[in-house]
Structure formats: structure tokens, C-alpha cells
Amino acid sequence: VLARAIGPSLTAVGVPNALQDPTLELHNASGTTIASNDNWKTDQQTQITATGLAPGDDRESAILSAPLAPGNYTAIVRGTGTNTGVAVVEIFQLP
């Protein structure tokens, strides 16, 4: 599974007030954080690039996870510091 938080790239497609530096957290059904990322190139860059789904901006976040057990999960996107704005969360099931 690849989860992405896209913000800065939205500006190029005309989305106003795009979140300029999103962070991403993935939580399990108990609310426990199972993964987090700020700036996708800081963690798992090689593996994320190999999927062909790397975010278009270095400030965007991505988490590459081993297959998740069936169940409910929550993705939380926040801006760093006091940043606010519009972001998109994308979840990809990889082969």
C-alpha cells in the first residue's frame, strides 16, 4: 500500500490555498500511529520511486507500507507548523 498526501502539486492544477507542506500519519483502528512521514524523500525514497507513484514535489508526504491486515485505517494530513490549506490523500494498492 502506498499512501500520499499531495498539497504543493495542487497549485499547478488551479486548486487555491493548497497546503504547502503536508505531513501524513496512518493510524490503525485503535488509533495507534503505525506510520508517519513529512517530505517523502526523507524516508523510503528508493522504494517509493520504484513504484512509479512518487509525489511530484519534495515537500509532499508518502508512506509505503507492507500489506495491511484487513480492517479500518485513518490517514491524517496536517500542515507543518501553522500551515493550513487544501490537500488530497491518495491510497494505492500495489501488486
How would you name each of these model-derived features?
Residues 20-90:
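Noncatalytic accessory or regulatory domains flanking protease catalytic cores in secreted, cell-surface
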